[in-house]
Amino acid sequence: MLRTVSVGRQYVQRYFGHCLIVNSVRHSSSATVNRLKQPLRRVFDDDSHWRALNHSNYKLNESKGRKFGLRSTSDLETGLFQNSYLKSANGLVEFTQHSFEKAKELVQKIHSIETQDEMKYYIKDLDQLSDVLCRVIDLCEFIRATHPDKKFVQTAQQCHEKMFEIMNILNTDVRLCDLLTQCLRESDVLGLDSEEIRTGKILLEDFEKSGIYMKPEIREKFIQLSQEISVIGQDFINNTEYVRSNYIKISCELMDAHVNKMVCSQMKKDITGEYYKVPTYGYIPHTLLRTCSDEVIRMKIWTEMHSCSDAQIERLTKLISLRVELAKLLGSQNFAQYQLHGKMAKTPENVSGFLESLVHSTRIKAASELKPLAVLKSELTGTQTPHTSEEVLELMKPWDRDYYGSIQALAQRRSSSLDNGESISSSFSLGVVMQGLSDLFEKIYGIKLVPATPKTGETWSPDVRRIDVVDEHDGLIGVMYCDLFEREGKTPNPAHFTVCCSRNMYLNEADTSTIQVGVNSNGQKFQLPVISLVCDFRWVEVNMGDGKHQQMCLLQLNEIETLFHEMGHAMHSMLGRTQLQNVSGTRCATDFVELPSILMEHFARDTRVLSSISSHYKTGKSLDVEVLKNHQLENQFLQNCETFSQIKMSFLDQELHNLDHTTDGSIDVIAIYHRLERRLAVLPDDQSNWCGKFGHLFGYGASYYSYLFDRAIASKIWDHLFEQDPFNRTNGTKFKEGLLQWGGSRDPWYLLSQVLDEPRLAKGDEWGMRYIGDVKTGM
């Protein structure tokens, strides 16, 4: 059955983990409307207000740490996401078993199909079977990544393995495939609509990619390999955040000569007293990368911060080896060829061509960005001044970026006339940005975000906000659970998780106890899409005046961009309301799924949008436009280097998944990584084994180029529809009705041809790839 993994934006902290430039603000003199009382803003900015609204879930959370409290799950109004089974980890097991039994009944029903009348509903029956499986698998993916209860997490892993294996078994069920082939062959007679036919073809591709036409022993081997890949992949993901060592030893003599005494005083020494134990996580190593003048110290710290354990490299090697074996088993030359079938890019050659088209121009731009830092380095170290791009790239190392960038940023701040000591984030509290997103969506799509109080037991943490998505015509069209605040043990990587897809109700579907149901303007019921947005924003204490202080989340521009990105996925899930769940929302081609989210980044960088949503947390005044424009210019610091980093990661993903042999010991992932870094030669890393920390190698195997590909597409759509007016309802409707609402139910190349008014794109050929790759600016 068709599956789509959760989508998210992983900020890889190789070079771009921390903003170097602290910008100051000046507010417009004209008073603005005080928006402090707006309900959406208030539930995110006023924690005491939220605690009062959600007191039952806070009380529940407190009782878990006491001997007395809620006595049993019967005291809960509901379970997670209003699924009554999900009141406990044991309830997840029961829900999995319930779904398994339901899936068995559906398979038996499908296997017994004989008449043409029964065949008419076959694709919908398959979609229902997929829905039953995916609602467990997607749920478990979310729980094991986010839930604070370890028992819940462990149970989710077990339930995921069970249902994932069942899904792979069904993907090799010959009877199911034969019936689908017959159904598609007789589609005209059966009266299937275009969405059913599209869904059927996608499902048939899934069967074929599972070796359905192979011998039984090969199909069994496919199931085994798929299961092993799933398990080792999750193990790989779970360990990407860990460094190789928690500290490194650097001599006291060297450190004392080049590091601020205050920083040194915060570090322990080893038993000999001759070496500092420099931590490789937390703020100290980042501080040293920004402030330490000695390149040897910076190199050692940077390398350890970006290195993982040997065991993690073994996990990655095993993952790649298993994928090669699976691809070979099913007749493909390599995993990239196997994986790209059915994607927009179609072949590894097309992907490589697209990436190479970006390399030359982006390298030149990156070298130009690095030149001032390289000149500064040459002046401070007494080396020859670099003039050519090659000389700049030869001189600059990845551990130089933060140090020389900080010096340059400090000089800029000292010469700036805008410095009043207050961060620009004062105008962008989390509540302000959420309200701004709602206002933007109302203008361009006709929908708004409305806060709702969750029932007791509905969320996994009391600080999770439930947000209802309301359409101006259809009313409630979806539900978002916003888990946006930092929490101990929580993943730092922002993500969008699909918990439940939008779809029409199935024929004779009576039991709706485990789903949330909506009713459209025509009175038709449908399964509400349910998603979770996960971020890790930090609380700070702010001065509200008159001696009052309050905890609040104030967002930097990169964090605003993150939130807009994830909200782009959310809008795709909410607006992609198809008949069938297999093609709803983000269930589309992997190299198309990032488009709506990356387009939202353009809105997040637009001065007009940011100015319209800004509101100082205390005064309510909007941010001065000129200050914002200056800040936007400063915020572009090394943006082409960041793009080139994405190119390098995309190439790494392709090179690892283009391997076509699995001889024991023949895959040296570190050597491949270092060779690639040296070839591409922008801030090259030939010291660490960072490839083992690149988590997207699992979730986006052979498809990481999608970020750059969709960046290029988003740039063209922005220029075509929103550059002149980001609040234009006509063009917003064109994007909504021409692309978002179809989810994966139409060919993405056709959808692009419609929204870009370029009919030739519908073919999805080499010309189309060149057209998309020809992006001069804006990526």
Swiss-Prot record:
Zn(2+) binds at H565, H569, H572. GO terms for cellular component: mitochondrial matrix. Its EC number is 3.4.24.59. It catalyses: Release of an N-terminal octapeptide as second stage of processing of some proteins imported into the mitochondrion. Its cofactor is Zn(2+). Keywords: Hydrolase, Metal-binding, Metalloprotease, Mitochondrion, Protease, Transit peptide, Zinc. Gene3D superfamilies: Collagenase (Catalytic Domain), Neurolysin, domain 3. GO terms for molecular function: metal ion binding; metalloendopeptidase activity. CDD domains: M3A_MIP (cd06457). Belongs to the peptidase M3 family. Cleaves proteins, imported into the mitochondrion, to their mature size. While most mitochondrial precursor proteins are processed to the mature form in one step by mitochondrial processing peptidase (MPP), the sequential cleavage by MIP of an octapeptide after initial processing by MPP is a required step for a subgroup of nuclear-encoded precursor proteins destined for the matrix or the inner membrane. PANTHER family: MITOCHONDRIAL INTERMEDIATE PEPTIDASE (PTHR11804:SF79), PROTEASE M3 THIMET OLIGOPEPTIDASE-RELATED (PTHR11804). This is Mitochondrial intermediate peptidase.
